[in-house]
UniProtKB/Swiss-Prot annotation:
NCBIfam families (UniProt xref): gltX_bact
EC numbers, comma separated: 6.1.1.17
One MF annotation (Gene Ontology) recorded for this entry: tRNA binding
Annotated compartments: Cytoplasm
Name of the gene this protein is made from: gltX
Domain of life: Bacteria
Protein's UniProt name: Glutamate--tRNA ligase
One CC-aspect GO term: cytoplasm
Keywords: Aminoacyl-tRNA synthetase, ATP-binding, Cytoplasm, Ligase, Nucleotide-binding, Protein biosynthesis
Amino acid sequence: MVAQRVRTRFAPSPTGYLHVGGLRTALYNYLFAKKMKGDFIIRIEDTDQSRKVEDAQQNLIKTLEWAGIVADESPVHGGSFGPYVQSERLHIYREYCDRLLEDKHAYYCFSTSEELEENRQLQLKQGLQPKYNRKWLPEEMGGAMPSSNIRKKMAEGSPYVVRMKVPDYISVWFEDMIRGPVEFDSSTIDDQVLMKSDGFPTYHFASVIDDHLMEFTHIIRGEEWLPSMPKHLLLYEFFGWEPPKFAHLPLLLNPDRSKLSKRQGDVAVEDYIRKGYSCDAIVNFVAMLGWNEGEGTEQEVYALQELIDKFSLERVGKAGAVFNVEKLNWLEKQYIKHRPAADIINTIRPVLASELAKRETLLSVDVITGDHYLEQVIELMRERVGFEHEFVTFSSYFFFEPESYEEEAVKKRWIPETNDLLREFTAELEVLEPFTAETIESALKAFVAPKGLKAAVLIHPLRILASGVSFGPSLYHMLEVLGREAVLRRITKGIEQISVAE
């Protein structure tokens, strides 16, 4: 027998941003499909029209593709199992709803929202789990409602929903690929609404039909869908379909182990993109929210292809995964340390162009926007920045004159003789050849030694005047990159602005 080609899906609702939990679900489905040489599909579940947000569908797919998760089939890419938007498949759901009605697995319900709420409150007072009281279950299906009443309501055009009839006193179970066997008692299962009064299906109904018709082999989704499983499995049974394999991913938790929510931090992938996190770090971080390669490995930084090669559902845990931003920050730094300079330049050049449009520079624009200059800045600052944009924003002194000097550092590092020493050393720098880190260091040491001074007496003031701050990369290499003209100009300006009383 030829094994069925693996097909997985990510099925978001177009209600806004892509949640980090949604990204993890999409990623795990993608990794599993690619590991198994199968297909990854995006389906848009827009049956709740009241929550639909304009452009959300395009933004979801765009964000996934930014992360390297490209679908084999989707509303954008097309495919043999379309349409891939549920609102374009309403005729399909109606057809299958009619089949369930005919087979007595579903029935019409005319209860008003007020009646449903009244029944719910009554059950809560009685200490019962709220569920539909089956007021409209017809006599021929074991209920109390005469068929004549139902026909009358239909003839009057009264609004209705269609509910599934959950069998009494049965056990529903399945084998979860992560959690093992899971069992449900049918007495806890409500007669789920399948078709709403607006003619749209509920998530539960449309999802099961589409998962079958689109021939998905594995459904990998969040733990929050686990309580819905018995309803879904019963629908598969009603239609006589073989259900796919299921895997329910662990919850994402805040550091205090509460459920991840916007109240305690950003939850939208777009928020992290705006802050400057790279797709490499975000994907790596999200992949490890529940999955690990296993004992015996210390690897924590993975390329996407490595994740595909090493991913398995057997290594996904059951316990909630803690969303630790510090770990994400650490990963971002690891990628910056090892990312090719050419790739970083592609990211920071637009950032630099934006800054140059807002601020004047005394440096040559052609020089500071060129590959050679940017490569030097990158190699000096790799260990010091947390985001790629900080090569420009955190290291602005490589591109713009310091607008001020760190006040506490000036107080600490300036003595009455500092400016005179700087003027005298400036004369050395004016004729220094070549103007390199090595020659600058040698010249400075040769300058202070006969005076019985330590190099620090000039190192710190030079750094403050050249950059405006008291910290940064190697002073000598920084001065070399800035170049003789900029260094002399900044020293002269600083001497004019900083004075210390005798």
